[in-house]
Amino acid sequence: MITLLLLLAACLLTCMGQVSQKFAVESWRDLPEGWALKLRSPWLWSALVCLGLGLLVWLLVLQRLEVGIAYPMLSLNFVLVTLVARFVFHEPIDARHWLGVALVISGVVLLGRHV
């Protein structure tokens, strides 16, 4: 059970890091050229923290699971980021993309039986 919770935590932290990156670059649109102001973005620092913590949790997952099982389960990030893209960023998602999401979920469920 702890392994599944760690895997879920790694997925959520990675997803939050990706979403924070998107918010960071969106917040840069109105900034002048150059990196000085961009590096002060709280979203950028949030992304770094989330991705760093996600890496540490991922290392704990790899201590408990075979990489051939663990890594494909990270594809849940594809599902999570797609949901955020649709409902937070209001990006259009076509039927083929939703089919891909369903297939990823099916694959994760099948792999989850090995955990």
Swiss-Prot record:
Q: Which GO terms describe its biological process?
A: lipid A biosynthetic process; lipopolysaccharide biosynthetic process
Q: Which domain of life is it from?
A: Bacteria
Give Gene Ontology CC terms.
plasma membrane
Record has Transport as a keyword: yes
Residues of the EamA domain: 44-113
Name where it's found.
Cell inner membrane
GO terms of molecular function: carbohydrate derivative transmembrane transporter activity
The disulfide bonds in this chain are none
TM spans, by residue?
Answer: 42-62, 65-85, 92-112
Q: Which UniProt keywords apply?
A: Cell inner membrane, Cell membrane, Lipid A biosynthesis, Lipid biosynthesis, Lipid metabolism, Lipopolysaccharide biosynthesis, Membrane, Transmembrane, Transmembrane helix, Transport
What is the topology of this protein in the membrane according to its UniProt annotation?
Answer: Multi-pass membrane protein
Q: In which pathway does it act?
A: Bacterial outer membrane biogenesis; lipopolysaccharide biosynthesis
PANTHER family given in the database record: 4-AMINO-4-DEOXY-L-ARABINOSE-PHOSPHOUNDECAPRENOL FLIPPASE SUBUNIT ARNE-RELATED, SMR FAMILY PROTON-DEPENDENT DRUG EFFLUX TRANSPORTER SUGE
As for family, the record states: Belongs to the ArnE family.
Q: What does this protein do?
A: Translocates 4-amino-4-deoxy-L-arabinose-phosphoundecaprenol (alpha-L-Ara4N-phosphoundecaprenol) from the cytoplasmic to the periplasmic side of the inner membrane.
Note the NCBIfam families from the entry. Answer: PRK15051.1
Q: How does it assemble?
A: Heterodimer of ArnE and ArnF.
What name does this protein carry? Answer: Probable 4-amino-4-deoxy-L-arabinose-phosphoundecaprenol flippase subunit ArnE
